[in-house]
Every structure is written in structure tokens, then in C-alpha cells.
Regions:
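Conserved alpha-helix/loop element of class I SAM-dependent methyltransferases that forms part
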Residues: 4-22
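Conserved beta-strand signature within the Rossmann-like core of class I S-adenosyl-L-methionine
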Residues: 116-124
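Conserved SAM/SAH-binding beta-strand->alpha-helix loop
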Residues: 51-53
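A short, conserved alpha-helix within the catalytic core of class I
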Residues: 96-109
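Conserved SAM-binding strand-loop segment of SAM-dependent methyltransferases
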Residues: 65-77
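Conserved SAM-binding loop
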Residues: 58-59
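A short acidic, Gly/Pro-enriched loop at the edge of an enzyme's catalytic core
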Residues: 79-88
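Short alpha-helix
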Residues: 140-161
Length: 187
């Protein structure tokens, strides 16, 4: 598992925003570490990723953990974003998108939340290019607080902060990292 099987720490710290039985979407969920963990907490989880290999590994992880997740193979543009369908959306390190695709993706994250629904998002900041411990090599794919504040202006920002931390998320995210985390609620 490129990013390990344990859930992301930012997600763990903020998953209390969702209660058992609520519907949560995990965007670009890779090999399933976050969706499987959320399902183990009693959430009704849907997840998608562009990689059929990643989704196959996610399905195997869910079976191993004895949980049910509705997985789909899709890219972000082709995914069937249902307006107002989710109590929560988890977007953890969804940083493969250039600025135009990112704008479409962020609009869909907002649109698919129910009123009162919560978005939990984490990504790398441009300072991450100094550390090279994970993430994309393109500054245009990285996040800043002002970018996120502007992109999610129609949501109520619960928490938005840039910080540094040691990540140990498989070989894909390993070492000192420059991060930004967002928790926001749809009005």
C-alpha cells in the first residue's frame, strides 16, 4: 500500500464531524485507507479513484476489515456528483489537479454536500517542494490558505491552518511535511 493502511491523521482528528449512519464521500481515495476507516466508524461510505488497481486493493482492505464501502472507478471529472447527497466529503491529498481541474473539483465538493454537511480536506503547501517527502512536484498543484479560503468562500470555515508535521503514511507520504488542513461546513 503506497500510503499505508492507517487513515490520515487530519481526517482522524476531524471525523467527529460525522455521526454513524451519515453518508460520506471519499474523493480520489486510492487504496482505501480512509474510506475503510470511516466505514469502521459506522458511516455509510462511498469512495472513488481513477485507478482500478487502487480500487481493487481498497475492496480487499474493506473485506479484510469486515466493512462495506461502495467503491467506484472514476476520475474526478467523470464522477456522478449528486447535488446535496452527502453529510460529509473527505478530500485528502487530492493534488493531481491543475488549476482548471481543481476549480471544477472544488465546485463539485461544495455542490455534493448537504446543507450542514462538512468537508474535511488536507493537502501540501508550496513549502513542501523544499522537503520532497511526498506530493506533486508542481507548485500549481499545491494549496495555500488564501487559495482554500477563496475557493470555499461559500462554506463556513471551521478550521483552516498551515502547519508542519512528520508523516508516516506508507512510502508515499513519509517525513517532515508542509501541510494545510481545512474543515468547512455548507450553509
Amino acid at each position: 500500500f503506497l500510503f499505508g493502511t492507517a487513515p490520515n491523521a487530519w481526517l482522524c482528528a476531524h471525523a467527529g464531524a460525522w455521526q454513524p449512519g451519515q453518508r460520506v464521500l471519499c474523493v480520489a481515495d486510492g487504496e482505501g485507507r480512509n474510506s475503510v476507516w470511516l466505514a469502521s466508524r459506522g458511516l455509510d461510505v462511498e469512495a472513488f479513484d481513477i485507478s482500478d488497481v487502487g480500487v481493487a486493493k481498497a475492496r480487499a482492505l474493506a473485506a479484510e476489515q469486515g466493512v462495506s464501502v461502495n467503491f467506484a472507478v472514476s476520475d474526478c471529472d467523470a464522477y456522478a456528483w449528486t447535488p446535496g447527497a452527502y453529510d460529509g466529503v473527505a478530500a485528502i491529498f487530492v493534488q493531481f489537479a491543475d488549476p482548471a481541474m481543481r476549480a471544477r473539483l472544488f465546485a463539485n465538493l461544495i455542490r455534493c454536500l448537504k446543507p450542514g454537511g462538512t468537508l474535511v480536506l488536507q493537502g501540501y503547501t508550496p513549502k513542501q517542494l523544499d522537503y520532497r517527502t511526498g506530493g506533486p512536484p508542481h507548485v500549481s498543484h499545491l494549496y495555500t490558505q488564501p487559495m482554500l479560503r477563496e475557493a470555499f468562500a461559500e462554506l463556513d470555515i471551521v478550521e483552516l491552518r498551515e502547519y508542519e508535521a512528520e508523516l508516516a503514511e506508507g512510502s508515499g507520504h513519509c517525513g517532515h511535511s508542509a501541510l494545510v488542513g481545512l474543515v468547512a461546513r455548507r450553509r
